[in-house]
């Protein structure tokens, strides 16, 4: 039976009772979809206990409207956790996770490209909340999707830099039948925007160069933040209407931009 925990002190008491068990952790901002469920299933396969967190982290939003419009589906998410046999759901409040009012934060002073360039202070918020959650949950393994690939690499670096006793595991992107990565933001797309998002996916996954992809997307009416190759992966961030979408794929060495 799934146990839902809001008070961090309650979780800390529970955590002491499962010290001898392997614990898998999937941190999310809720609005769960099949991509999240794939992370949870892997955790269940590899650990005795699985913990899911549902917390819309205010410090990682550089756009107040984006934070305001982020889907809030707590009851639905808890029901999905119960249906999928998740042991614990951690659903803290802002004040509980940020008793310091964000006076203390984790930052990476070397990252300045891709998401770091277009979303100022975003990764400060991400790394800070991930550090807090990892210290609270003390998981054996924590699972992150490769859709947010830059975030995944930073979290791995965080765990290594601070000697955290948690294995950070990246999991493959779950896509729809058109190749579009599953994302909570997709649910905010209108029917016309969804068609355009599919075109973004089709063009991005083509054999075109970065510049050719960018030009093709612009011709479709899609606003492009970046299309670039880095460390043998191709990355994209675009706007379809007021919805920002990201994606990344590995690429052959002879197909760099």
UniProtKB/Swiss-Prot annotation:
GO annotations of cellular component type: cytosol
Main location (coarse class): cytoplasm
Catalytic function, reaction form: (R)-pantoate + beta-alanine + ATP = (R)-pantothenate + AMP + diphosphate + H(+)
Pathway recorded for this protein: Cofactor biosynthesis; (R)-pantothenate biosynthesis; (R)-pantothenate from (R)-pantoate and beta-alanine: step 1/1
One Gene Ontology biological process: pantothenate biosynthetic process
SUPFAM superfamilies the record matches: Nucleotidylyl transferase
Binding-site positions, beta-alanine: 60
Gene3D superfamilies (alphabetical): HUPs (3.40.50.620), Pantoate-beta-alanine ligase, C-terminal domain (3.30.1300.10)
InterPro entries: Pantoate_ligase, Pantoate_ligase_C, Rossmann-like_a/b/a_fold
Catalytic EC class: ligase
EC number: 6.3.2.1
Coiled-coil zones: none
Residue sites binding (R)-pantoate per the record: 60, 151
Subcellular location: Cytoplasm
Statement: the UniProt record of this protein carries the keyword NAD: no
Pfam families, A to Z: Pantoate_ligase (PF02569)
Subunit field text: Homodimer.
Additional free-text comment from the UniProt record: The reaction proceeds by a bi uni uni bi ping pong mechanism.
UniProt xrefs under PANTHER family: CYTIDYLATE KINASE/PANTOATE-BETA-ALANINE LIGASE, PANTOATE--BETA-ALANINE LIGASE
Family affiliation: Belongs to the pantothenate synthetase family.
Known role: Catalyzes the condensation of pantoate with beta-alanine in an ATP-dependent reaction via a pantoyl-adenylate intermediate.
Name this protein carries in UniProt: Pantothenate synthetase
Native organism: Coxiella burnetii (strain RSA 493 / Nine Mile phase I)
């Amino acid at each position: 039976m799934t146990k839902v925990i809001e008070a961090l002190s309650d979780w800390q008491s529970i955590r002491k009772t499962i010290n001898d068990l392997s614990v898998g952790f999937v941190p999310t901002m809720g609005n769960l979809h099949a991509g999240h469920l794939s992370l949870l299933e892997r955790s269940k396969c590899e650990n005795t206990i699985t913990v899911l967190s549902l917390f819309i982290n205010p410090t990682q939003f550089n756009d107040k409207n984006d934070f305001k419009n982020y889907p809030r589906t707590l009851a639905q998410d808890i029901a999905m956790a119960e249906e999928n046999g998740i042991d614990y759901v951690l659903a803290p409040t802002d004040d509980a996770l940020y008793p310091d009012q964000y006076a203390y934060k984790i930052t990476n002073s070397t990252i300045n490209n891709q998401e770091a360039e277009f979303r100022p202070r975003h990764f400060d918020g991400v790394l800070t909340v991930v550090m807090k959650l990892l210290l609270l949950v003390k998981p054996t393994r924590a699972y992150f999707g490769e859709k947010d690939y830059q975030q995944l690499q930073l979290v791995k670096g965080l765990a290594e830099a601070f000697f955290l006793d948690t294995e950070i595991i990246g999991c493959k992107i779950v896509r729809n039948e058109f190749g579009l990565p599953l994302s909570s933001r997709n649910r905010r797309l209108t029917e016309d925007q969804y068609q355009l998002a599919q075109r973004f996916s089709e063009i991005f996954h083509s054999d075109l160069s970065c510049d050719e992809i960018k030009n093709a997307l612009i011709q479709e009416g899609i606003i492009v933040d970046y299309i670039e190759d880095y460390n043998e992966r191709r990355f994209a961030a675009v706007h379809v209407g007021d919805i920002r979408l990201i994606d990344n794929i590995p690429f052959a060495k002879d197909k760099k931009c």
